[in-house]
Every structure is written in structure tokens, then in C-alpha cells.
Amino acid sequence: MIVKCILRKIVTATCRRAVGPALLSMLVSLVVAVPIASADDPKAREIMERVNDRDDGDNRISDLRMVLIDKKGNERIRETRSYAKDRGDDTLSLIFFLSPADVENTGFLTYDYDESGKDDDQWLYLPALRKTKRIASDDKSGSFMGTDFNFSDLTEPDLEDYDFELLKEEEVGGHMTWRIEIVPRSEEVMDETGYSKTVVWVRQDNHVVIRAVNWVYKSRRRKFMQVTKLERVDGVWTSLEIKMVTKEGRAVVHTTILQFSNVRYNQDLSEDMFTVRRLEKGA
């Protein structure tokens, strides 16, 4: 869940809730075939609400470099540009791939709705096929463009779908954090997101999720997310580098590093930019 938010916040450029939003993301090996019983912790839920409500800046443009590393250490680089616009409590986001040539002008459009229970809309444009694919709910647990992030990581989670438990307070990287366990309330949510449980570390001074571990649903794999570069940009705490490592046991299966640059807030972005028609025009 936190991965979704962090990734969304970084990749799509706005995460009004917790770790898109972005990233949303946004994120360990307990395989469950049925929903997990978990008591909801009011204090933990309040912390996560503050994470979601923190200032993440408005209309944003940023460049994103994706580094994909396989288990043998081979790297692939992808360059993208992302745009995001707030529309009331909803967020519209658009990502264009600039390079390499085999993914150039591939685009990804997201309508991230704030309304509880309303499914977010996502479209993926594949220029080689001249085809736009709408991402169905049962496809959102799949990998986004070969990265360690799922499609579900790119939208904001609905907090009503989860139970929260404050595990402890501890220092991480010189900052005090809350360690919180997040468990989906239904098997349906696990299936749609691809995760059966998430543990996050939230900085107490700014309510930014700086670390997360995700148990992959019906798998022995876990995903380890860490914000490796966090700075204020125009007064907004912004994750400029995020690392996600997928492991099976102790073995590293794959790694994705997201590096953000040229981050600009309060940009003049028209809603006309966030349409399927614009998506299909490319960068």
C-alpha cells in the first residue's frame, strides 16, 4: 500500500496521501489464501491519515530516470517525463517514456479518485501496436513496464480497505520513525494490489514514508522499498530517489531505482492534457 503512495508521489508527481502518489507503490513471505484477521489501531490509522493529508505540492512536472537491474547485475535505463494535476480532491497524472527507442512514446494515464470505494482509472498506450489498453482491476497487480512496481502502486490506496497496527518507534537514518503494519481487510484487495501485507516506516518530523516492506500475495517474494534521497523542493518534502528490491528468500531477483530531477511545482497544466487522446499523441 505504501509503495503505491510513494511511487505515485514520485512517479506521477503527486501524492496527497501516503506513501501518488504517488509511488505510489508505492510494498514480505506470509502467503495467505484468506483474509488476515487484524485489529485496527486508531493511533496507527491516524498517523497514516496524516501521511495521506500532508502537503505534497500542486501541479507538478518532473523527469524520471528508471534503472532496472536483473539478478545478474545487467542494467537497463529508461527515461520518462511525468505530469500531474490536482482536480479537486482527485489527481490526474500522465507519464511519457522518452527512451530507449523500443518504449519511446509509450504513455500511462491515471485518474486517481479520492472517493472511497471508487475504482481508479488507468490507461496504457503502446505505440508499437497503436493501441491503448485500459488496465482492469484484476491486472493492477502486474508489473509496470518491467519494473518492481505494480500498476496498483501508481494510485492512492483507500485507507478503508486496510487495518493498521503501530508496531514500535525506532530510529532510521538519524530520524525517529513509526513502524506500522498494514493488512488488507479482504482477499479481494490482496488480489488486486498483489500484496498480502505491508510494513512501513514513517518519519515523525514530516510524515513521509521512507521505508517499506511488501509481502507479495501468494508468493515467497518480498519487495523492499527505501527512499534514498529526500529533499525539500519549493518547500515540499520530495522523494528524489527510491530503490525497490524484490527478493525471494535472501536472493535478489530484481531491482528498480527511480531517480527524479527537474522537479517543478505549481505549473500551469490544462486538464486537456490528461485525456486518452493526448496520451496517444506521445511526448
Go through each PLM region and give its residues.
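Short, solvent-exposed mixed-charge patches
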Residues: G282-A283
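N-terminal mature ectodomain segment of secretory-pathway/periplasmic proteins
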Residues: P42-A128, E165
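Boundary at the C-terminal end of the N-terminal hydrophobic targeting segment
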Residues: A33, A37-A39
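Short acidic/glycine-enriched loop/turn segments that link adjacent beta-strands
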Residues: D89, G173-M176
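N-terminal secretory signal peptides that target proteins for export/translocation
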Residues: M1-R16
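Gly/Pro-enriched, hydrophobic low-complexity segments
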Residues: L98, L109, D121-Y125, K133-I135, ...
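A short, amphipathic edge element
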Residues: R45, R76-I77, L154-L167, S219-F224
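Bacterial N-terminal signal peptides
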Residues: A18-A33
